[in-house]
Amino acid sequence: MLLAQINRDSQGMTEFPGGGMEAQHVTLCLTEAVTVADGDNLENMEGVSLQAVTLADGSTAYIQHNSKDGRLIDGQVIQLEDGSAAYVQHVPIPKSTGDSLRLEDGQAVQLEDGTTAFIHHTSKDSYDQSSLQAVQLEDGTTAYIHHAVQVPQSDTILAIQADGTVAGLHTGDATIDPDTISALEQYAAKVSIDGSDGVTSTGMIGENEQEKKMQIVLQGHATRVTPKSQQSGEKAFRCKYDGCGKLYTTAHHLKVHERSHTGDRPYQCEHSGCGKAFATGYGLKSHFRTHTGEKPYRCSEDNCTKSFKTSGDLQKHIRTHTGERPFKCPIEGCGRSFTTSNIRKVHIRTHTGERPYYCTEPGCGRAFASATNYKNHVRIHTGEKPYVCTVPGCDKRFTEYSSLYKHHVVHTHSKPYNCNHCGKTYKQISTLAMHKRTAHNDTEPIEEEQEAFFEPPPGQGDDVLKGSQITYVTGVDGEDIVSTQVATVTQSGLSQQVTLISQDGTQHVNISQADMQAIGNTITMVTQDGTPITVPTHDAVISSAGTHSVAMVTAEGTEGQQVAIVAQDLAAFHTASSEMGHQQHSHHLVTTETRPLTLVATSNGTQIAVQLGEQPSLEEAIRIASRIQQGETPGLDD
C-alpha cells in the first residue's frame, strides 16, 4: 500500500526547508483509511500528509504533517489504520547553532507492524558511544542509529544527528540499506535553520552549547506506549477556565473536563421519552442500563447477590463488606471517614452549614445539604408514593425506592446488615446501629448506601397513590435528617389503612381499622433502642389542642424525663412550633386533617415515635403486620 512518495515536480508540493541547503519539494499521498479521533468522534482527516521513514529492521515509520504549516496540532490524538492511537505534543528543541528542530517532542508515529513510536530529543552526552551506529547522508550530515540502554530491551532508539560532519564512516553494513538512508535524508531535511536571529520555528531561542539531534523510540509489542506512559504520568494539560486550573494527562481528558464548565453534553439518550444527555459516552452507557435493567457488575462476596450498573457502584458496595473508608473529612478535629466522596461532600456541609437545595413550595423555606434529602422532602408536599411492593398480598407503597428496597427483607430470611466487630447480621440497619452502640460502644453513624444502589428498575414508579399525610419534621442544627411520615392512605375499593413509618425509615407497616380498634386507646412510645415507654392516657391531652408536658413512665412504672406532646389539631401548629422552638430538638406536627396522632420530642434529643388513640404502638403494629404476612412474630434482633 502506497502511503507516501517523493516527487520533485511542482504539483501538490510541500516544502521542508533545511539549514544551508535548498528546500525539498515533497508530494505526500494519504490513504482514506487514516482518520482523526477527536475525543470519541471520528472525523475524516483533511489536509494531512504522511512521510515514510524506513528503519534498519525493515519496518516503516510514517511521520504525519499538516499541509498548511507542516506541523501537527498540539494535543491532537490521531487514530491510525490498525485502530491504535497516536498522540502529539509540542516542545522546543535546543541545538548548537542557536536554533531548534521543527519536530515535536513526544510526536507519535505509527509503524508498519502496528507499534507506536514517539520522537524524543536527547543530548549527545547521554548516549553510550559504543551503542551508536553512524551513517553518512548525501548532504554531508551524519545520522546515528542509537540503541539506548535506558529503555527496555524491547525498545529501539533511532537517533539522528542532523549537523554532524564526521567523515569516513562505514555504511556498508547489511543492516543499513539504501532505502533507510534515503528516508533518513528526508527526515533530516525537516531541520529548519534561521542563522540570522537564532529563533526556532516555534519561537523559542535555542541553546548554543547543545547539539541539535532527535531520536525515535520504537516501542515493542511487549510494552505498548500510551499517552500516559509517554509522559511518565505527568499531567501536562491544564484547564484554562478561571478558578479551575486542574491538570490532566491527555488532551482528551481535558476536553471532557471542560464540558463541566461549558455544560456541553453531546451524548443524548435515544430511549423513547427520556432525552437525558451526558458529557461522556460512558455516562450515557451507564444511564441506558436504567432503561434495560442490565446490571453486569456482580458482587463476588459470599452470600451477597447484589449487582450494579457500573463498576464504580460495585466498588462502593464492596467497601460495605471490607469496611474501607478511604475518603476522610479534611476539617481539623473531625477525623471521620466515608465510603464515597459524595457522602464526604455532604458531610462537609455539616461543618460549613451549606444547604444548596431549597424547597420551592410556598411557605416552606426549608433547605437541605443533600439532593436525596431534598427529593424525599418534596414528596411530603406532593404526597407521592410511587414505589409499590410487588410481593402478592403486600401492596405497600413508599416515597423512595431505597425504602422499598430495604422493605423487601421482611419477605425473605435475608439479613444483609452485618456488624464489622463481631459479624452478627440483622435485617434492619437501625437494629445493627443499636447493637453496635450497646455491645461495642460504637456510636459511629452508619452511612446508607447511596441512591445509585437503589435506583428503580425501568417503568416502576409511574402509578402514584396520593392520600392525606401526617408528618413530623425534625429540625436539627448542622445535620439533615429525612422527615418521618405517618401517612393515612385511602384507596378506592379498599378499607382505610394507616402506614406506620419508623424514624429511620426502615419499618413500614399497614394496619387496618379493625386492627387499630382492637388495640385500644393506649399511648405507647418506642425509643430508638427499642425500649417501650407507656404514658398515662388523659382525655384532655388527647382531645385538646396545643402543647402539653407529661412525664414518661417506663414499663416498670418508674417516672422518667419530661416530654412535650404536640396535639393533632392543625390550628395548634403555629403555637406548638413556637413553644417548642427553644428545645434542642423539636418536632412539629403538619397534618391535612385531624387524626388521633401525637408526636413528641425529649429535651436530650432522643428520637421517639408516639402513636395515640386508635392507633397501636409501633411495636405492636409491626407484630400484627408480620403475623398477617408471614405467620410469625419477629423479635428485636430481626
Swiss-Prot record:
Q: Which sites are covalently linked via Glycyl lysine isopeptide (Lys-Gly) (interchain with G-Cter in SUMO2)?
A: 213, 406
Name one cellular component (GO) term.
nucleus
Record's subcellular location:
Nucleus
* Lineage top rank: taxon: Eukaryota
Zinc finger regions, C2H2-type? 237-261, 267-291, 297-321, 327-351, 357-381, 387-411, 417-440
What PROSITE patterns does the annotation carry?
ZINC_FINGER_C2H2_1, ZINC_FINGER_C2H2_2
Could you tell me which InterPro entries the record lists for this protein? Znf_C2H2_sf, Znf_C2H2_type
- Point out residues bearing the modification N-acetylmethionine: 1
Which keywords fit this entry according to its UniProt record? Acetylation, Activator, DNA-binding, Isopeptide bond, Metal-binding, Nucleus, Phosphoprotein, Repeat, Transcription, Transcription regulation, Ubl conjugation, Zinc, Zinc-finger
Phosphothreonine occurs at which residues? 352
Pfam families the UniProt entry points to: zf-C2H2
A single Gene Ontology MF term assigned here is: DNA-binding transcription activator activity, RNA polymerase II-specific
Primary location group: nucleus
Record's keyword annotation contains Transmembrane: no
* Family (UniProt): Belongs to the GLI C2H2-type zinc-finger protein family.
Describe its assembly.
Interacts with CHD8. Forms a complex with HCFC1 and ZNF143.
PANTHER family noted in UniProt: TRANSCRIPTIONAL REPRESSOR PROTEIN YY, ZINC FINGER PROTEIN 143
Give a short account of what the protein does: Transcriptional activator. Activates the gene for selenocysteine tRNA (tRNAsec). Binds to the SPH motif of small nuclear RNA (snRNA) gene promoters. Participates in efficient U6 RNA polymerase III transcription via its interaction with CHD8. In complex with HCFC1 and ZNF143, regulates the expression of several genes, including AP2S1, ESCO2, OPHN1, RBL1, UBXN8 and ZNF32.
According to UniProt, the name of this protein is Zinc finger protein 143
Q: Which organism is it from?
A: Mus musculus
